[in-house]
């Protein structure tokens, strides 16, 4: 029979398939599957995945970032921390208003920043001499742009400005160009800068307290010790030399350790401005300088006399209130991002805790018997602090 004469095969039954059930709606997962780049929260991570997947970037990128960061770091440091072109050592920018000129009005205002050791000098003298009511205070904080700024929690109590630069710029005499630094002693009546050099502000406050009689007998700037004070103040500032040679820093600390092992304060039994200048450096050493500035040969706590000396001053009335360790750490590790680009804040060392700084210092024995028999002899607040700490 011919092929075409055979009956056709019966038609197969039609198989109807049901559509697959819809996938559960996961907007994030769907966006990630369709567009992993768009789903990424981090633009740098997204770009990295687009170019290289999940693998590490190639060595060329590492080299480019390394050299680019080094160049950017150098530029930032030249602006934020000027240095000697020949040696690379830190060179502090001279103050625009280095001395008190004339006689300021009675309406004075002090601007400080808690992380700054130079501003801390003025703040410490204000506390030691009992000038809190006489001298109102505004505390600036490091802003994201590196400028001293004010916040709702730490406002400009005088004018309500947002930046310290705006206070400088509001001066009546020709405005201001340059760095808006702290400390700043401001004449609120005449709207002009009195001084922004820390040691000169400290000396002025000593004279102000003596005239007001608010110092309680404490004289941080006695005429008979001024030559020694100036010598020690200059020596205390040599901590900046670690940028050039760390050996100079630790040689200076060794010399101070030796001197203070036989003398309660730098100039004998009397607390002076020289001690103020040194204290604001020492109280930051283990907290900041040891790790951030790579001063790692020894910690301050390893110097028995220096650490006891620091505790001695810390325990004087009003001093602890000027030492905000959290603000100091944040000001260095958070604001100085060229030195700590990750912005990670380390734990406060045990030696810098209030509990450690309030431990007995035992330095009363270094005071001469003549000073003890005199009942304080011109240093009443100092002996009051000693008795309070025991």
Predicted regions and their residues:
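N-terminal chloroplast transit peptides
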Residues: 1-29, 36-39
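GST-like domain detector, emphasizing the conserved glutathione-binding G-site
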Residues: 29-266, 303, 336-390
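Amphipathic alpha-helical interaction segments
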Residues: 200, 271, 275-276, 280, ...
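Surface-exposed helix-capping loop/turn segments at secondary-structure junctions
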Residues: 211, 258-269, 292, 317-323
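Acidic, serine/threonine/proline-rich low-complexity intrinsically disordered regions
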Residues: 240-243, 290-304
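Short amphipathic alpha-helical segments
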Residues: 251, 280, 301-312
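GST superfamily/GST-like fold recognition
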Residues: 266-292, 299, 313
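A contiguous, mid-protein "functional segment" used to position or interact
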Residues: 305-337
């Amino acid at each position: 029979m011919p092929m075409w004469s055979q009956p056709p095969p019966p038609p197969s039954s039609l198989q109807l398939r049901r559509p697959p059930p819809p996938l559960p709606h996961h907007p994030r997962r769907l966006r990630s599957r369709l567009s992993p780049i768009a789903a990424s929260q981090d633009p740098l991570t997204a770009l990295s995945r687009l170019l290289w997947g999940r693998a590490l970037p190639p060595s060329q990128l590492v080299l480019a970032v390394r050299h680019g960061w080094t160049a950017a770091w150098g530029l930032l440091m030249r602006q934020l921390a000027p240095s000697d072109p020949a040696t690379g050592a830190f060179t502090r920018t001279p103050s625009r208003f280095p001395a008190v000129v004339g006689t300021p009005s009675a309406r004075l205002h002090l601007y400080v920043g808690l992380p700054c050791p130079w501003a801390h000098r003025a703040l410490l003298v204000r506390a030691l001499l009992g000038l809190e009511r006489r001298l109102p205070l505004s505390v600036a904080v490091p802003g994201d742009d590196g400028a001293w700024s004010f916040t709702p929690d730490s406002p400009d109590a005088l004018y309500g400005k947002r930046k310290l630069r705006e206070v400088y710029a509001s001066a009546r005499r020709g405005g201001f160009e340059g760095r808006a630094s702290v400390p700043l002693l401001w004449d609120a009546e005449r709207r002009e800068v009195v001084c922004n050099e820390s040691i000169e502000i400290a000396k002025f406050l000593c004279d102000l307290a003596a005239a007001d009689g608010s110092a309680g007998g404490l004289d941080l700037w006695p005429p008979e010790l001024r030559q020694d004070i100036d010598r020690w103040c200059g020596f205390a500032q040599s901590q900046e030399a670690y940028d050039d040679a760390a050996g100079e820093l630790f040689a200076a600390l060794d010399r101070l350790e030796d001197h203070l092992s036989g003398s309660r304060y730098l100039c004998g039994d009397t607390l002076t401005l020289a001690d103020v200048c040194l204290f604001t450096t020492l109280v930051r050493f283990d907290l900041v300088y040891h790790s951030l500035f790579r001063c790692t040969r020894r910690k301050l706590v390893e110097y028995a006399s220096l650490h006891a000396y620091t505790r001695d001053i810390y325990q004087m009335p009003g001093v602890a209130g000027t030492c905000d360790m959290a603000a100091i750490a944040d000001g260095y590790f958070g604001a100085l991002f060229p030195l700590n680009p990750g912005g990670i804040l380390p734990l406060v060392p045990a030696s810098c805790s209030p509990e450690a700084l309030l431990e007995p210092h035992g330095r009363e024995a270094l005071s001469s018997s003549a000073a003890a028999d005199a009942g304080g002899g011109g240093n009443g607040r100092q002996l009051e602090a000693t008795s309070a700490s025991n």
